[in-house]
Amino acid sequence: MYNKSISKIDIVQDIAKELPVPPVISYFLCDCWYVSEKIINTFAAKGFRTIGALKTNRMLYPFGFKKKLSEFAVLLSVTCSDFNLVTVKNQKYYVYRYEGKLNGIENAVVLLSYPEKAFGNPKALRAFLSTDVSLSTDEILSHYACRWPIEIFFRQCKVHLALDGYQIRSAQGIRRYWLLMSLAHYMCVAGNGEFCSFENGYHQISNIIQMEKYRYLFQCAKASTDFDSFIKLAV
């Protein structure tokens, strides 16, 4: 669906440039691959602030000294006294709030986070960035958490609805495909008469379609006297 010779950063920048200016405070939510100076500045030019995950090898400047985020977290994690215990969607995390410079970003908030039961574990360390420094720690994490349903939607569409399996060149074609894909997703969630998870609905509909195929083949077999006549009916 896109020219693979063009970088993802360039694609996201082009998308950002086409967005209308938001009428209210709005945020670009992203994973760590898109937290770059170019993308942040492009969205900022359109009126969007950025909230995203951050790689733990990014450089921070705490107290004016250059330090890799993961190394800074190790120094802080000797005790949890510098961390606040925060609850997001019923899950608790120890969070340290840094505000200051990053490479390519003059001023932003960076949150260093550990799950409550994995404090100080380097493998459990997660970091998040917000270019809106006026947001509280809870607000940043709550906004970022809104990304997950969107992420799950796209993953479901890629795995089950062939989102990444088509090459469509026209804008009208893309809009039509998007409409059909969204309708198919909705049918999986609500098409059985009651709301259910996408996975359950998808498997239920798949089973119904498969049973209809078997029923059709069975009817063809009943109406046939030999293999050749069966093939004529079934194919």
Residue ranges of each PLM-predicted region?
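Single, function-defining residue in the core of a domain
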Residues: 1-235
